[in-house]
Amino acid sequence: TKYSGLNATELAISESQERMAVVIEASAEEEFKRYCAEENIEVTHVADVTDSRRMRMYNKGKLVVDLSREFIDSAGAKHYAQAAIGAVEERDPFRREVKGGTLREKMLANLADDNVLSQKGLIEMFDSTIGASTVLLPFGGRTQRSETQVSVQKLPTDGYTDTASIMAFGYNPFLASWSPYHGAAYAVVDAAAKVVAAGARYDKMRYSYQEYFERMTKSPRTWGKPLGALLGALKMQVELGLPSIGGKDSMSGTFEQINVPPMLMAFGITTVDAGRVISTDFKKAGHSIYLVRHTPLENHMPDTGALKRNFDFVSSAIESGKIVSGYAVGFGGVAEALAKMSFGNGIGADAVSYTHLRAHETRGNL
């Protein structure tokens, strides 16, 4: 527990952070403790599995909790709530207006946005090379200034391997605030697009969802937000064939009158041949730059049929060596993508027109 001096009730119901419960054979206890000691992990024997069909907890030799297995299986009293998914504002949720009169002013304003600017100072506080498994550093290129959108790590194994895990996340708080349904759907798409842009196939991805919402009240509108988000994510799971195998939720995102935006953040992971992974930085002057466009449906939802075709096309082109750099267009639009792809090797880009540099953030574009 986080605090000392807790009474028996507090100990029984307290939440333990950064802990892991492991069930082992009694005969393996000493061997297991030895392994933990080798990894400098504190381990404590806290319970035994019995055939009494009761969960009993003791504190200082005194029985303080005694619950039947049948009661635990019932999950307690049933709760019911009404949910109402509210209508959304009639507008283009992807359109952004960037301040500035000239192209230079707009580019600088876009790159200075809190959701676009570099987080290198924060990232450098963490060691990305631990375990000698890192395939892509957080920033790539000769100058190490092109932002990487995925985490790629070779699998820990004895001997040599080219198999790596590749993971990315997706979430846009502005889109989710406009519509939790759309926000969750595009969170799934965003993570898949980043993985594809780095050289992996999307169709074997598995997800974990991190959900964080305001405190639930008696208002059906508050319950409608997590319901809408889960429906949006489920729709993408079904249409893209990408299941979520875990997750975590919290409904305590309220402080006085301040609520967190509706959040369903999608973390997607799959495997990839490390030799096929590509970075975001431009490699050579004279290379052509293409936008593989995703056009949302009239209701602003992802066109999953088009996305699957685009993802397959890009993956095949990367595997054949035709694509050497990739970036999933995000909050800052194509303008952000071109700038960040340029920084790594100091190689610029000539855009055909300002239209192609707009800072709209249509998700799923590569």
Put a short name on every predicted segment.
Residues T1-R358, R363:
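Glycine/proline-enriched, intrinsically flexible loops and inter-domain linkers
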